[in-house]
Amino acid sequence: MIGLIGKKIGMTQIFNEVGHLMPVTVIQVEPNTVVALKDKEKFGYSSVVLGLGELKEKHTSKPYAGQFSGDIKPLKLLKEFRDFDKEVAVGDKLGVEAFEKVSYLDITAISKGKGFQGVMKRWGYGGGRASHGSKFHREAGSTGHCTTPGRSFKNTTMPGRMGFDKVTVQNLQIVKIDPELGVIMVRGSVPGKKDATVFLKSAVKRAK
């Protein structure tokens, strides 16, 4: 598996080689720094820790800065990728060219927050009649039972805070890679708002 940290720029559309219009998401990947390497002998598993984004010294605590060795300055974002397929060393820089032999990606990000929402928006309830004397429009209706069990079961769909969850979209096709601009385009949409941090990994359910 190969992974990188990126930033969602936004969506646009391009024509493919057949002439069909295709929606794509543009993701910017600045050079990721290899912060640490973990092996099976010491940690029980093998992984690579990547970092991105400079962090001012006044915003860095000594325990946090202690995990950066050598000439590597403290970085804002850290992400650990297990079973890394590429041979790397601490201090190396990785860009979008790492995905040149990859066709599909799994992308993880924090979805857009919607705030407190009702059952119609959050769970797709149909609601009640809009007219003819109805006094039941957007309510959830009954959520409980009779004397037995005398309560509402857990995980009953109710109003509540919606969105702002960790979401992974699998098997997004890579449409274009531009190493000069540090940009990668994938087919379809990606979770999160503009400028959101996204984690890109080679798809686990496909060979490449």
Swiss-Prot record:
Polar residues: compositionally biased ranges: 144-158
Gene3D superfamilies to which the protein is assigned, alphabetical: Translation factors (2.40.30.10)
Coiled coil segments of this chain: none
GO cellular component: cytosolic large ribosomal subunit
PROSITE patterns in the record: RIBOSOMAL_L3
Region called Disordered, residue ranges: 134-159
Molecular-function annotations in GO: rRNA binding; structural constituent of ribosome
Residue spans crossing the bilayer: none
Highest taxon of source: Bacteria
Pfam family, one: Ribosomal_L3
GO biological process, one term: translation
Keywords: Ribonucleoprotein, Ribosomal protein, RNA-binding, rRNA-binding
PANTHER family: 50S RIBOSOMAL PROTEIN L3 (PTHR11229), LARGE RIBOSOMAL SUBUNIT PROTEIN UL3C (PTHR11229:SF16)
Subunit structure: Part of the 50S ribosomal subunit. Forms a cluster with proteins L14 and L19.
Family: Belongs to the universal ribosomal protein uL3 family.
Role description: One of the primary rRNA binding proteins, it binds directly near the 3'-end of the 23S rRNA, where it nucleates assembly of the 50S subunit.
Protein name as catalogued: Large ribosomal subunit protein uL3
Taxon lineage: Bacteria, Pseudomonadati, Spirochaetota, Spirochaetia, Spirochaetales
Gene that this sequence comes from: rplC
